[in-house]
Each structure stands twice: as structure tokens, then as C-alpha cells.
Amino acid sequence: MTDKIRSVQGKVVSDKMEKSFVVAIERKVKHPLYGKFIRRTTKLHVHDENNEAKVGDTVEIRECRPLSKTKSWTLVRVVEKAVIA
């Protein structure tokens, strides 16, 4: 069985939890009737063992076994740090 582990990039929208954060993944979906592409956002809870990611960072995450009721993704790396203004 060759299951491919899903890996996606997204933006951190919340890091208020200990060893966890929330990532927003944006995708474009075609409207079934009118054909216009609409932006849809999915929020995922991600495990971050070392509390590396902060709000605004772009991160790469991958799917893993369920770690809690809502967490089944883990941090791979921080792709881009947020610019602090």
C-alpha cells in the first residue's frame, strides 16, 4: 500500500495554544453554476513541538496520525517568517 502523505503550505493565523497553532489554507474553487473561481479557506490545527511558528508566518505542514480531537497535522518547516512592522 503506497499512501501519499499530504503536505500543504499555509499562513499561521493563531499561535495562542501551547505546542499548537492554526493555519489557514486558501484554495480556489469553481462555482458550479456560474463558473467563477471563488476563494475558500480551510483552517487546520497543527502540532508544533518547539513553538517555532508565529502569527503571519508561512509554514509547510504534513498530515500525521490524530494527536487530539482536532489535531492531525504537524509542522515540517517555517518557509517564510512574518515581517514585524
Curated annotation (Swiss-Prot):
GO molecular function: rRNA binding; structural constituent of ribosome
Keyword rRNA-binding in record: yes
InterPro entries linked to this entry: NA-bd_OB-fold, Ribosomal_uS17, Ribosomal_uS17_bact/chlr, Ribosomal_uS17_CS
GO biological process, one term: translation
GO CC entries: cytosolic small ribosomal subunit
Protein keywords: Ribonucleoprotein, Ribosomal protein, RNA-binding, rRNA-binding
CDD domains: Ribosomal_uS17 (cd00364)
Protein name: Small ribosomal subunit protein uS17
Subunit structure of this chain's protein: Part of the 30S ribosomal subunit.
Family: Belongs to the universal ribosomal protein uS17 family.
Species: Haemophilus influenzae (strain ATCC 51907 / DSM 11121 / KW20 / Rd)
Signal peptide positions (record): none
Domain of life: Bacteria
Described purpose of this protein according to its UniProt entry: One of the primary rRNA binding proteins, it binds specifically to the 5'-end of 16S ribosomal RNA.
